[in-house]
């Protein structure tokens, strides 16, 4: 159900509270998922004119789970705070004295419900952490992370239900990784969606038993960061080592991700240097180039009255990854009607060269390769 459809069914006096939740409500570490509501119902009599829904189920993303809490207002007394039912978490009993925004409920503040939900989620986190006491190993993992503020202050924990047969229970740690994405080139962060939310990397680590014999890590990147780093398949994190600890494993993943970000940033500046060198060396031979991301360059060159194009595609992780050179005849066509071309990656190249050296080496390579390309174009293409 879309937020607009849901709000149209809510009692008008309660609508500001719910609007703040579904339109602006982001609670916890997962900034890519908003709060949402379902199961709208009314406690009013059938004679009450609509819209009159005053109770609903609130879906809250937390530690890779979705909490489903029932929130019950009274449309006849909209100035009163709501009641809460915590669904499957019957053991979760919040401390009323710690719910400041519920105790001092202010119906003139449209964010009062959202503020109460945030306080409840904080208490729910403490409730889940306390459940780890049933396992000394999981408690050790939690306490060692807690001692490091960069991890302990950005962590959610969900302790699963105890297995009736084995007495074991699973637990999931969700951590917001302290990786700086602020220097990623802005062109890589475009065109994902209108409201991408916070740029964030979350590491989920699931312990399927209390002795950590089955541990499954997974990395989640917000849409813009995933796009900027080359897609979901571009980053593979290591398996959790047997006998390993989170306090050792999490920094490894942070280091891996930080290096990936640095590769992207370095690639952007190196591509810009590369294209600047080609502009200097080839001058009027430059037909066009990508002036934003510096990922493409096209040259129009001549060798003994034979004109040809060279399309240069620079990869995301340049200079580590070698550019592709595509030679294209301006005279000859393939059977499908396309200009005859050949792509080359087997040419002199070193990622240690600066842009000027790469341009000089490319110019020398063009002179040696063009004669055989011209011959192939005449042999395989049509005028």
Curated annotation (Swiss-Prot):
This protein is called BRISC and BRCA1-A complex member 2
Provide the induction entry: Down-regulated by DNA-damaging agents in fibroblasts, by retinoic acid in brain glioma U-251MG and promyelocytic HL-60 cell lines, and by bacterial lipopolysaccharides (LPS) in peripheral blood mononuclear cells (PBMC).
A single GO cellular-component term from the record reads: nuclear ubiquitin ligase complex
- The lineage's top-level taxon is Eukaryota
Reply yes or no: does the keyword DNA repair apply.
yes
Q: Point out residues bearing the modification Phosphoserine.
A: 2
Q: Name one GO molecular function term.
A: peroxisome targeting sequence binding
GO biological process annotations for this chain's record? apoptotic process; cell division; cellular response to ionizing radiation; chromatin organization; DNA damage response; double-strand break repair; mitotic G2 DNA damage checkpoint signaling; mitotic G2/M transition checkpoint
Q: In which tissues is it expressed?
A: Expressed in all cell lines examined. Highly expressed in placenta.
């Amino acid at each position: 159900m879309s937020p607009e459809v849901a709000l149209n069914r809510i009692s008008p006096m309660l609508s500001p509270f719910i609007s703040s939740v579904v339109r602006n409500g982001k609670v916890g570490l997962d900034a890519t998922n908003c709060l949402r509501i379902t199961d709208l119902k009314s406690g009013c009599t059938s004679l009450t004119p609509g819209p009159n829904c005053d109770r609903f189920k609130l879906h809250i993303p937390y530690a890779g789970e979705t909490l489903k809490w029932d929130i019950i207002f009274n449309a006849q007394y909209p100035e009163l705070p709501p009641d809460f039912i915590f669904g499957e978490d019957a053991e979760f009993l919040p401390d009323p004295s710690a719910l400041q925004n519920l105790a001092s409920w202010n119906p003139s503040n449209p964010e009062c419900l959202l503020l109460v939900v945030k306080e409840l989620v904080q208490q729910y986190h403490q409730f889940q952490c306390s459940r780890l006491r049933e396992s000394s190993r999981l408690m050790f993992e939690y306490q060692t992370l807690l001692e490091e503020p960069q991890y302990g202050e950005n962590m959610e924990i969900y302790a699963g239900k105890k297995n009736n047969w084995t007495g074991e229970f699973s637990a999931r740690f969700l951590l917001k990784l302290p990786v700086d994405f602020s220097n990623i080139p802005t062109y890589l962060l475009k065109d994902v969606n209108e409201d991408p939310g916070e740029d964030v990397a979350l590491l989920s680590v699931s312990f399927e038993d209390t002795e950590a014999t089955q541990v499954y890590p997974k990395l989640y990147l917000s849409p813009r960061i995933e796009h900027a780093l080359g897609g979901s398949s571009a980053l593979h994190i290591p398996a959790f080592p047997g006998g390993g600890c989170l306090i050792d494993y999490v920094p490894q993943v942070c280091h891996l991700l930080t290096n990936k970000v640095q590769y992207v940033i370095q690639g952007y500046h190196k591509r810009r240097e590369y294209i600047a060198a080609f502009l200097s060396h080839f001058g009027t031979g430059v037909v066009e180039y990508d002036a934003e991301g510096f990922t493409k360059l096209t040259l129009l060159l001549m060798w003994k009255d034979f004109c040809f194009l060279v399309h240069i595609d620079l990869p995301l992780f340049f200079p580590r990854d070698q550019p592709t050179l595509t030679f294209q005849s301006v005279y000859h066509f393939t059977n499908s009607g396309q200009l005859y071309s050949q792509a080359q990656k087997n040419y002199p190249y070193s990622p240690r060269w600066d842009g000027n050296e790469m341009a000089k080496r490319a110019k020398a390579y063009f002179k040696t390769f063009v004669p055989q390309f011209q011959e192939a174009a005449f042999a395989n293409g049509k005028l």
